């Protein structure tokens, strides 16, 4: 009976029918803590604290509790996490490199490890003896990642800032005392240039062991093995995760290497960002890629789809030093963060709030989950410490002594609905708070330098100062009829050109008293039966935009008849026009300086002699008035008004002037001709005379406007 009862009793962790019973392990995540004995300071060569960059638990069965830590000065230390004696806690310490060690990897099943350093080399070490086995040379920049295959102990891969991925085999003989790469992928994460595609040309044979190119802008940040013949890599700027087949030769042709599969950047950022860490779950199916856009993407490494299966949010990733790790059973994901904490997500529920390991005072960079013990986690931080987190053994509440010894604790992060929505959409503009009476000036960003120099200090400005003063605003117009409604604006199609010129911002469209305009208004003049107002464009006149402001030189020129004529706005040397006021002055020899077009219709045909004050204008218009009767002048004015001038108009004018009988009868034609030649531009071409267009075929300018309705 006793034997049967023992056999029928369910085993620990199994149900009644022998099926494994799954415990809710996520409830245990909040029980992680770190005490002072598990906090280790990373010291440099001179005894000063330096930040640790990499940590990894051993893969040897009898040494799975040994933690290897590499720091910024190239020192590697081995800690026994099971030992409670502080004197025996540090197992081994040696100077691996003279530069920073960025990554570290254990040889599967052996007491050896490989370090990747900023001195452009990777070294193989015997950790028990502390001796150097071999040195790998071939990279031309810092090495950022090193990884071993689970199926091969002698083969490992490295990735560097030179953009190259190199394969190493420690079974090969050393040349010159160093290991050389057996295979390499040059420019693994170079940006694709669509305008200048690479040409298919054979590579020239190069010296074995030297990388053919250096491109620090296309750095390879992480390389891991998927299986014996496949590696996965990620870069710093291209935002693509690539899978490579090592059985293919990528250096035979001068072209960018093509991976067998790639995962494009799945985020919403306009600029493709890079990845700082890649990690596979124990089955090798799920690939976790930690991106610098504060997301961890989970891809199906064995499937055909390239879209992420899940996205883990909540942490911050602002550097390429932040790494990730997976629990031994593959149920949880661990990652460092820039907000001084480590995060743990449940893989099966990515939308659930993560558990944070708090206590560090700087960025948490490298993390490691012990593959032989679920209850043990290691974290490295920029606060120059390495911490080992363990599950609390007791189920009772912590005593006062335990709280004093605790330097790290775990808690569940609370997600706010606004923060979750902000991760899924583009942030909008902040709304203005109506309750606040002050508007603060912008504060410096968190990444701004401390030495601000002469920059102004943040201040608060009353909102009332930003509001417009009602005294400075235009008051509402009140109708004369007594109604408090402003008159209806006239449509632009029914308004004449006079309304556009004389209206001011404070005047209405129609009023009983005309509001004087600050600009000179156009005065209506009598028009010819078939000719509108005309203007002659002189030979040396330059085309420019019409301005209604008065120039400083002609500010004193006032028309005696108050005709409101439009005067010249620029000096005569720049813009000389046919000013009717100057012509009228020479005709009457009086103070009346205004000439209206109605006088021209009466047959005004006299020759004007220029006065000293108007010599500049009269020299330009003298030859034009000598053309003959008024009908010829009308024809010229009409052509200049209603048609654009031809390129040979200057030569045609001179030819017509020479052939005029009145000009032949004049006493001194040579002086006038010389004056005209001085006014002509040098580059005027000589071409035949153009025939003017008959005025009958032209449309009157007055037909383009509507009469103002009264």
UniProtKB/Swiss-Prot annotation:
SMART domains the record matches: WD40
Asked whether the UniProt record includes Acetylation among its keywords, one would answer no
For this UniProt record, give its keywords in alphabetical order, as a comma-separated list: Biological rhythms, Chromosome, Cytoplasm, Cytoskeleton, DNA damage, DNA replication, Nucleus, Repeat, Ubl conjugation pathway, WD repeat
Which segments show compositional bias classed as Low complexity? 430-450
Q: Which domain of life is it from?
A: Eukaryota
SUPFAM superfamilies linked: WD40 repeat-like
Q: Tell me where in or outside the cell this protein is found.
A: Nucleus; Cytoplasm, Cytoskeleton, Microtubule organizing center, Centrosome; Chromosome
Motif Nuclear localization signal extends across 197-204
Q: Which pathway does the database say it acts in?
A: Protein modification; protein ubiquitination
Q: Give the GO biological process terms.
A: DNA damage response; DNA replication; mitotic G2 DNA damage checkpoint signaling; proteasome-mediated ubiquitin-dependent protein catabolic process; protein monoubiquitination; protein polyubiquitination; regulation of cell cycle; response to UV
The entry's protein name is Denticleless protein homolog A
Lineage summary: Eukaryota, Metazoa, Chordata, Craniata, Vertebrata
Q: Which gene encodes it?
A: dtl-a
